[in-house]
């Protein structure tokens, strides 16, 4: 096994037994690939911007004299990089420039003669860019566009399952859903007539559509029915016989031919009878005349002589009509074949309810239904129907839609056609009728073959197209206005509607969400989320049970575990670990191909549609050495049903055991032992874990922690291999390996780290290096850990020593008892960064001013501000402190006589400004870690702003200079090697100044060329440095583009350190959550015979009823892992020789190992020392989902660590020293601190704002509201008879306006009496009664 440099430092022991055929794919590819498709120039014009432009352009004027053509587009360079956009609060985007060509035709010359062509590049707004981590920065905040799961375009056959009509009759329907355009529905009513609806409007008989397509009644019947031919021979009526049609009928007369009776009258026709008839080749039988009565004619019969209609198509035949026919000389007669079993008379019945007779009347009928109240004209009706389904501008099935449509109706041609045609409509009606006749199945809407994913790129393209269509109308009008001789393309195009559409989508669409940035896992999960809500999707209220439920096609595509609890359950899903989107937007999952009974390593991706036809074995099927199945019968799935199949029938096999579940669920060890409901909570709660001060890797993991940490983008990952040249807290420099160099570059990679930045959830983002100078790294190695990562592995919480036992009721009902040591060691201390901003605006009365000179504020309150009135960095502030002093001009006020007197005596003008400073919110206390000042262009910068500017310039220069020196050093090293090769000696080189090296000349021509090349590069490097610095300087010194009316913005960042305390919520990874009830002194905690106390005591009663046994296994394995770490620590302390250490490590890694095969002998002595050093805190183990460590391995591990195999220890009470009466399960569990902190939730109201109508206090912490004293609480006080308390609650403490003002006055005066009055809600009641027209007045006593 080859380990990367960081992996070697701490190898995670793997208990997995299945071979890893496929690595987990890049986790963010669903976002990045989709957006890449949108942005990249697609020569075919299938996707993205190119497709949008081609679908709207060329735009022709109404009179056809000119047109605007699209040539190409290009995206410019973004003005600011991602970090600058976040600081300045702007959108990270590129300008879109489109090359357009205006062609003017000559009116007088023949059509198509060009008079003039003008080409120009036109600016069409900004396109937001995706960052490399799959997010967008919109107005300075990171957002994610969630992918949407919507109904695929195509045709769907469905039934109402007997719910619509009271009789319980099943009504079938078909619906054609285009990608854009009108829906077309066909449906049966309870009388079995077929109707059509357009866009869910009023229904019309379905034959109307066929009439519009130019079909007559006879042609319609011809399409939908088989015919029966009758012939009159020698005064007898003969019927053409197709024996199969008689199946299941009861004979109403003897069926005979050539004197042989096949079926007697009144008998049922059976299969035997039919075989007999077929064998004897009977084609015609004689039928009584009455038999034809009531049958339906298939076409019109006209009396040739008189020209009158004897019988029309679709008319029932009577004896009279029969006589007329034979009189007119008709010997043959065609009637429709119908029966009650499988050839219903539906279309024939429908034609009878259809009032229209020809194409025009049908068109008019459709026009009336679509545009009620408008007078129909032939032209309007024609064009309306044409534009509904047959015009490419208004209607598009899309490639997916056409593919689904064709596969549904079995059509081979029309691959590219986006509109409908006659064949499509007729085939859909035919299939619907055959389903009604009992042939064929209805579709399953929740099948993932009928639902597709719409990702970022596609949604952005649709929005962009909407903007373009808006522009198109304006362009058409401007083109038609006449004088085009001096008009350029940019005069025609207004970019506003385009950028507005795009901005609206990214800024306020339901699927553009504020990124969940609690920890790396929550970021990754948010980007892999699939929502059924949103525009064009479902709504919470309308979504029923079926849509939300787990479907068999979710297997390996959508996770059955991870979904929110609450109203969105099942509507928001997560992508499974290996799933991906195919070109049509359907989800695919990988399987290993089975060839001739042998499982190969070839992997095929199958969509839900393709999967149906195969037999697929599970990932844990037993295999032989050769790769065949060990068992005769293999558990496998076919069409979603699990069962035992002979091994010869198996076509595919799962690639991995965690293929079924999402990333979050794959991070839960022993998931297979947890109940599904608890696993759901576990998966969801990991996303709420707050990054702790020092991240600690989980002792018991699942082996995919590294994937999540690296793919999430919070770590710094080596782009190329090399050697670490220098490391400090904010930068890592790597000297790149020779073989990975691009010819002619300096060969230095510089990684700038993110320090103490605020995340969207106010947690702290900070990267710290985990490599040392001189260490070799390869491409993809982790160089620096981000939040919640430890040596490149995801680390959401801490490993805590846990005991399962009750402790004095402090762990009743999921409470958690925590040792004080956990607080002292800062195990769960987290840093939260808050951003507070102060905006100075230009008001009507004058500009607001940021200053330290604030009226009526004491010296003490201003002690932390500098002369500009802004708090200094490092100040420790608490609730109510001033951060930024600001004054606002206030209008002239009427002076009181006293003030006039004072004015007259002292002659000073009373201040005409009021204090509107930014103060720290009441519940916050912390340290100021950063201040940023943004000043509008043209407004003079204050001293503090200039200081910050100088500091930034200095830092930028230092960064760039260092970067330049590093690159220069790399370049000169290459020059030196060229000169040495060219005959210079070391001594000679050291005598020449380094800068002069480039001016030397060499005899060897090749080396001289190299030297000249390097000299050129050096000049480029210098020029590049100057250019970069100038750009940086311009960005720092230029004014900021602030919102209208804003002069200055000051942003202050506070860091708040939160220790763990009672009331905080904690959880394990198995859905075992609880609230801390008490923090207990270490000396009172239970301890084992070595005197080691436990950190946390959990209630054992939380396990059995919840059935999450995974946590118990985790605790046992954690104890063993820690025990092995202790043994290694002991060996290091005793300074035992390396050979013994190697032997022990090998023994540990070999235990229960089938696939990892760690070979300690391959590691150098230094590597072994590093490894042993990193394992002292415990041996990290991986137990993959559904392939975890068996009980035997856990016991063996415990024995190896010299611990009891039961995993239970004798504990002693810390308070008395007595042993507890039975052994207790003790071990290590990975605990998380969730982002539900008691500090953010505790709140108490003194006095505050009141609701306008009811005059009652508001509710909620944000409004500084009170606690609601509701109906039930009133009953409680009534039951106690606490009359005075009750009166106080309902009056002065709530909505008695006068009473509460008096109360306030009384308290100030030291008089604690209350005078209750009339509650405002009583007045509201009076008003409501009056609004009903009943006058009600209060009488005074």
Swiss-Prot record:
The keyword Transcription applies. It holds the Pfam family RNA_pol_Rpb2_45. One of its GO terms (cellular component) is DNA-directed RNA polymerase complex. It catalyses: RNA(n) + a ribonucleoside 5'-triphosphate = RNA(n+1) + diphosphate. Coiled coil: none annotated. Its EC number is 2.7.7.6. One of its GO terms (biological process) is DNA-templated transcription. Gene3D superfamilies: 2.40.50.100, 2.40.50.150, 3.90.1100.10, DNA-directed RNA polymerase, beta subunit, external 1 domain (2.30.150.10), DNA-directed RNA polymerase, subunit 2, domain 6 (2.40.270.10), RNA polymerase alpha subunit dimerisation domain (3.90.1800.10). Keywords: DNA-directed RNA polymerase, Nucleotidyltransferase, Transcription, Transferase. HAMAP family: RNApol_bact_RpoB. The RNAP catalytic core consists of 2 alpha, 1 beta, 1 beta' and 1 omega subunit. When a sigma factor is associated with the core the holoenzyme is formed, which can initiate transcription. Belongs to the RNA polymerase beta chain family. This is DNA-directed RNA polymerase subunit beta. It comes from Vibrio cholerae serotype O1 (strain ATCC 39541 / Classical Ogawa 395 / O395). The lineage of its organism: Bacteria, Pseudomonadati, Pseudomonadota, Gammaproteobacteria, Vibrionales.
């Amino acid at each position: 096994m080859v380990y990367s440099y960081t992996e070697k430092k701490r190898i995670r022991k793997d208990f997995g037994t299945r071979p890893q055929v496929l690595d987990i794919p890049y986790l963010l590819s669903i976002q990045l690939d989709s957006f890449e498709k949108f942005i990249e120039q697609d020569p075919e014009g299938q996707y993205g911007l190119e497709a949008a432009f081609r679908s709207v352009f060329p735009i022709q004027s109404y009179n056809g004299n000119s047109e605007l053509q699209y040539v190409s587009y290009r995206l410019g360079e973004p003005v600011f990089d991602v970090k600058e956009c976040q600081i300045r609060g702007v959108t990270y985007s590129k300008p879109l420039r489109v090359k357009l060509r205006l062609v003017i035709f000559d009116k007088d010359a023949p059509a198509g003669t060009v008079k003039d062509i003008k080409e120009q590049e036109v600016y069409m707004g900004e396109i937001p860019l995706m960052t490399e981590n799959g997010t967008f920065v919109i107005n300075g905040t990171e957002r994610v566009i969630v992918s949407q799961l919507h109904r695929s375009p195509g045709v769907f056959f469905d039934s109402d399952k007997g719910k619509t009509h009271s009789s319980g009759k099943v009504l079938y329907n078909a619906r054609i859903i285009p990608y854009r355009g009108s829906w077309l529905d066909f449906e049966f009513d309870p009388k079995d007539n077929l109707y059509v609806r357009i866009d869910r409007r009023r229904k019309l008989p379905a034959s109307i559509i066929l009439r519009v397509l130019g079909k007559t009644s006879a042609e319609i019947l011809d399409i939908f029915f088989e015919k029966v031919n009758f012939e009159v021979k020698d005064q007898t009526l003969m019927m053409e016989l197709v024996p199969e049609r008689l199946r299941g009928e009861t004979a109403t007369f003897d069926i005979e031919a050539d004197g042989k009776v096949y079926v007697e009258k009144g008998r049922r026709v059976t299969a035997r009878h039919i075989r007999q008839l077929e064998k004897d080749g009977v084609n015609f039988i004689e039928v009584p005349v009455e038999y034809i009565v009531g049958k339906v004619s298939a076409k019109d019969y006209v009396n040739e002589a008189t020209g009158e209609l004897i019988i029309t198509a679709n008319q029932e035949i009577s004896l009279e009509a029969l006589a007329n026919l034979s009189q007119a000389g008709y010997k043959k007669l065609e009637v429709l074949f119908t029966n009650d079993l499988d050839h219903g008379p539906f279309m024939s019945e429908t034609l009878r309810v259809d009032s229209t007779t020809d194409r025009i009347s049908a068109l008019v009928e459709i026009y009336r239904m679509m545009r009620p109240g408008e007078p129909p004209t032939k032209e309007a009706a024609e064009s309306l129907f044409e534009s509904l389904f047959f015009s490419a501008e208004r209607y598009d099935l899309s490639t997916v839609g056409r593919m689904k449509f064709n596969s549904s109706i079995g059509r081979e041609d029309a691959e590219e056609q986006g509109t409908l045609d006659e064949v499509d409509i007729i085939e859909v009606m035919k299939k619907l009728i055959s389903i009604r006749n009992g042939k064929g199945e209805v579709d399953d809407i929740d099948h993932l073959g009928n639902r597709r994913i719409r990702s970022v790129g596609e949604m952005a393209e649709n929005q962009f197209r909407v903007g373009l269509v808006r522009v198109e109308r304006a362009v058409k009008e401007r083109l038609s206005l006449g004088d085009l001789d001096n008009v350029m393309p940019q005069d025609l195009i207004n970019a506003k509607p385009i950028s507005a559409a795009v901005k609206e989508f990214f800024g306020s669409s339901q699927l553009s969400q504020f990124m969940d940035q609690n920890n790396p896992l929550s970021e990754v999960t948010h980007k892999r989320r699939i929502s059924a809500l949103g525009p064009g999707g479902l709504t919470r209220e309308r979504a029923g049970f079926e849509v939300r439920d787990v479907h068999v096609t979710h297997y390996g595509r959508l996770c059955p575990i991870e979904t929110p609890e609450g109203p969105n359950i099942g509507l928001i899903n997560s992508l499974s670990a290996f799933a991906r989107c195919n070109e049509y937007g359907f989800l695919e999952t990988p399987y290993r191909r089975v060839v001739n009974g042998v499982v190969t390593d070839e992997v095929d991706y199958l969509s839900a549609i393709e999967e149906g036809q195969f037999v697929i074995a599970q990932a844990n099927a037993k295999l032989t050495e050769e790769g065949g199945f060990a068992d005769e019968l293999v558990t496998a799935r076919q069409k979603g049903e699990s069962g035992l199949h002979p091994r010869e029938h198996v076509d595919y096999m799962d690639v991995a055991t965690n293929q079924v579940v999402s990333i979050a669920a794959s991070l839960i060890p022993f998931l297979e032992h947890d109940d599904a409901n608890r696993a759901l909570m576990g998966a969801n709660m990991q996303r709420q874990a707050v990054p702790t001060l020092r991240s600690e890797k989980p002792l018991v993991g699942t082996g995919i922690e590294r994937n999540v940490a690296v793919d999430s983008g919070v770590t710094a990952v080596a782009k190329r291999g090399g050697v670490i040249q220098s490391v400090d807290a904010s930068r890592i420099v790597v000297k790149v390996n020779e073989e990975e160099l691009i010819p002619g570059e300096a060969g230095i990679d510089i990684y700038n780290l993110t320090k103490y930045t605020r995340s969207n959830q106010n947690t702290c983002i900070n990267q710290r290096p985990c490599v040392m100078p001189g260490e070799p790294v390869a491409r993809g190695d982790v160089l620096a850990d981000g939040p919640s990562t430890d040596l490149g592995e995801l680390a959401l919480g801490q490993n805590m020593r846990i005991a399962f036992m009750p402790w004095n009721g402090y762990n009743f009902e999921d409470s958690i008892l925590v040792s004080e040591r956990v607080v002292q060691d800062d195990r769960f201390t987290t840093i939260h960064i808050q951003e507070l901003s102060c905006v100075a605006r230009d008001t009507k009365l004058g500009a607001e001013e940021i200053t330290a000179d604030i009226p009526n504020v004491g010296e003490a309150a201003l002690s932390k501000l500098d002369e500009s009135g802004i708090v200094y960095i490092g100040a420790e502030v608490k609730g109510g402190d001033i951060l930024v002093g600001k004054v606002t001009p206030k209008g002239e006020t009427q002076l009181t006589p006293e003030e006039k007197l004072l004015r007259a005596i002292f002659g000073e003008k009373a201040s005409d400004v009021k204090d509107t400073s930014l103060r720290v919110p009441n519940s916050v206390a912390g340290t100021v870690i950063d201040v940023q000042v943004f000043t509008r262009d043209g407004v003079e910068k204050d001293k503090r702003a200039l200081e910050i500017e100088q500091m930034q310039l200095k830092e930028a220069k230092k960064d760039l200079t260092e970067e330049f020196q590093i690159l220069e050093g790399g370049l000169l090293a290459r020059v030196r090697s060229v000169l040495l090769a060219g005959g210079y000696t070391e001594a000679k080189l050291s005598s020449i100044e380094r800068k002069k090296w480039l001016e030397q000349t060499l005899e060897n021509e090749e080396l001289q060329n190299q030297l000249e090349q390097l000299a050129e590069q050096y000049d480029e490097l210098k020029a590049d440095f100057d250019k970069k610095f100038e750009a940086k300087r311009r960005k720092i010194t230029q004014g900021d583009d602030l919102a209208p009316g804003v002069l200055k913005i000051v942003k202050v960042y506070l860091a708040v350190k939160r220790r763990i305390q009672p009331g905080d919520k904690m959880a394990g990874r198995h859905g075992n959550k609880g609230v801390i009830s008490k923090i207990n002194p270490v000396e009172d905690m239970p301890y084992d015979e070595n005197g080691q106390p436990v950190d946390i005591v959990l209630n054992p009663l939380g396990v059995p009823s919840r059935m999450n046994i995974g946590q118990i296994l985790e605790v046992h394995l954690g104890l063993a892992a820690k025990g092995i770490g202790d043994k290694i620590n002991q060996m290091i302390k005793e300074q035992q020789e390396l050979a013994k250490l190697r032997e022990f490590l090998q023994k540990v890694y070999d235990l229960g190992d089938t696939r990892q095969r760690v070979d300690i002998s391959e590691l150098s002595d230094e590597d072994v020392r590093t490894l042993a050093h990193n394992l002292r805190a415990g041996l990290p183990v991986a137990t993959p989902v559904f392939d975890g460590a068996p009980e035997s391995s856990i016991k063996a591990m415990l024995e190896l660590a010299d611990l009891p195999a039961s995993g239970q220890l004798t504990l002693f009470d810390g308070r008395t020293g007595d042993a507890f009466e039975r052994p207790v399960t003790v071990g290590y569990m990975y605990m998380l601190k969730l982002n539900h902190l008691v500090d953010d939730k505790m709140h108490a109201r003194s006095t505050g704002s009141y609701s306008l109508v009811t005059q009652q206090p508001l509710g909620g912490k944000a409004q500084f509201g009170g606690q609601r004293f509701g109906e039930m609480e009133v009953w409680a006080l009534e039951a106690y008879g606490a009359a005075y308390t009750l009166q106080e609650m309902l009056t002065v403490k709530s909505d008695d306006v006068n009473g509460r003002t008096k109360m306030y006055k009384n308290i100030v005066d030291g008089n604690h009496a209350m005078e209750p009055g009339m509650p405002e809600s009583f007045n509201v009641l009076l008003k409501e009664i009056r609004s009903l027209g009943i006058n009600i007045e209060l009488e005074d006593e």
